Swiss-Prot record:
Main location, first listed in the record: secreted
InterPro entries linked: Huwentoxin-1 (IPR011696), Huwentoxin_CS1 (IPR013140)
Pfam families assigned to the protein according to its UniProt record, in alphabetical order: Toxin_12 (PF07740)
Keywords recorded for this protein, A-Z: Disulfide bond, Ion channel impairing toxin, Knottin, Neurotoxin, Presynaptic neurotoxin, Secreted, Toxin, Voltage-gated sodium channel impairing toxin
Its job: Inhibits selectively tetrodotoxin-sensitive voltage-gated sodium channels (Nav). Does not act by binding to receptor site 3 to slow the inactivation kinetics of sodium currents.
GO molecular function: ion channel inhibitor activity; sodium channel regulator activity; toxin activity
Misc. comment: IC(50) is 42.3 nM on rat neurons.
Paired cysteines (S-S): C2-C17, C9-C24, C16-C31
Domain of life: Eukaryota
Keyword Secreted in record: yes
Assembly information from the UniProt record: Monomer.
Protein name per UniProt: Mu-theraphotoxin-Hhn1a
Subcellular location field: Secreted
Length: 35
C-alpha cells in the first residue's frame, strides 16, 4: 500500500507511490510528482 498524490507523508520513511513517480516532499510533507 503506497500513498497517492497530495497525501501526507514522512520524508524519513517515504511511502509515496514510486510507480506513479511520487516522492515525499521534505518541505511540504506530502506526496508530489518527482520532476
Amino acid at each position: 500500500e503506497c500513498l497517492g498524490f497530495g497525501k501526507g507523508c514522512n520524508p524519513s520513511n517515504d511511502q509515496c507511490c514510486k510507480s506513479a513517480n511520487l516522492v515525499c516532499s521534505r518541505k511540504h510533507r506530502w506526496c508530489k510528482y518527482e520532476i
